[in-house]
């Protein structure tokens, strides 16, 4: 379960985004809809621990993330949360396999990477560098990287934007 309470984000240019209190129950899927620039990606980035809120709290499975130690935050980011970024966040000069395999450095078991790549119809590009892939292929790699962790929580920021 994810609980958002009195959450807000202030940016240097004085832009402030405020969110309603929201509870995302475990085992359910949710979709955020809104105009460009309204803060959907910012909210996902705060839940993932990439951005810190200016006010309020994010509670994941009973743990208030703003009060958690960095070790606990890392445990959640690595083990509980898979994030499919809008702009892929892949390393262009590395292969598909290496972009997923790099998760091993964080202790993630990627032993079923090949099966994940096959299920997303990108296995044949396993040894290709990211810079040689189409947008849709890069999106599939980003999805595989998020899912290979078997996370409890999947955050997806426009995950099908480049798929055909």
Describe the residue ranges of each PLM region.
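Conserved catalytic motifs of ABC-family nucleotide-binding domains
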Residues: 150
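ABC ATPase NBD coupling module
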Residues: 65-82
